[in-house]
Amino acid sequence: MNPTHELGFLEIMKISYVMPVLLIMSVVMVAVLIERLMFYHKMAGVDPLLFKRIKSFIVEGKFKDAEAVAAKGEGLIADALEAVLTAAHSRNRAEMDHVLTLYFQRTQSMLGRRLGLFGTLSFISPLLGLLGTVLGVMTAFRDLALSGTGGPGVVAAGISEALVATAAGIFVAVSAALIYNYFNFRLKHVLNSLNIFGQEIALIVTIGRDV
């Protein structure tokens, strides 16, 4: 390990009380990001080809085959379509809509889990950076008063503290905001696809033909 880099990191952490807090927030953000990426990769897939196969079996009246295709699919949408197809045996539109609504809410809850953390971090990180700025300015004026002399060297440490803390807070906030918007876009895409697929299946079952 290069001691220069280690010293630089330690010095940055010592610049302000805000820096360790921002570091912890960054570590938590990255950990949740990795967990959510893995979950979305496994459970948030949208497969139009799977839906087309299910749809073709429904048009032919082969509900068991359609259920089997849905059961082989992976992800929350496949689970929801399988449940809707199970309810389709009764050909009761209200029952199918009820099942679709339940799975819509379930999908929204599972995909939306922990996303609020990114929104919270994007909001409070700049405030922590601002706190670091205030503390840095206070340190600069304190050093100036204790020195009894003026000059840029006296206040340099306090100003650097303010700038580093502010930059770190903005960096964490921007990163969290981008992550939140990305997952929010994915969430809306999955929910819209689920609603369209489910409603189309229910309509085909109800009227007995393709739409």
Where are these regions (language model features)?
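Alpha-helical transmembrane segments of integral membrane proteins
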Residues: 19-32, 119-126, 172-176
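Acidic-residue sensor for enzyme active/binding pockets
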Residues: 35, 161, 200
